[in-house]
């Protein structure tokens, strides 16, 4: 079964997030043309082969902070108490669009 256009758009945006950076579900949604919850659903169903740990809530929290922390440490992404330091590592929709070009 082929992936829907929405799934392809979301996964394409997630694929351009550089190592050492994160973004929020909302920022991915702005670029993919959908809602933040749609991004979460796509990643839940199709995100196992993506860098899912680079997509976090707006406050920097992960849906699975224990697993994400392993990846954050590998990529030197500063975090504490299950939250990424967004001001240090976060990128926004404008930056994501530039990376998509």
Predicted feature residues:
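Nucleic acid-binding interface residues in structured DNA/RNA-binding domains
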Residues: 1-101
């Amino acid at each position: 079964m082929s992936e829907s256009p929405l799934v392809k758009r979301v996964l394409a945006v997630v694929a351009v997030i550089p190592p050492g950076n994160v973004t929020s579900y909302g920022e991915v949604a702005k670029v993919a043309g959908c809602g933040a919850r749609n991004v979460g659903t796509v990643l839940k169903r199709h995100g196992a082969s993506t860098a899912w740990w680079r997509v976090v809530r707006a406050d920097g929290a992960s849906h699975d902070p224990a697993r994400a922390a392993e990846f954050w440490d590998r990529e030197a992404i500063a975090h504490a108490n299950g939250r990424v330091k967004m001001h240090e590592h976060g990128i926004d929709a404008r930056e994501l669009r530039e990376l998509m070009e």
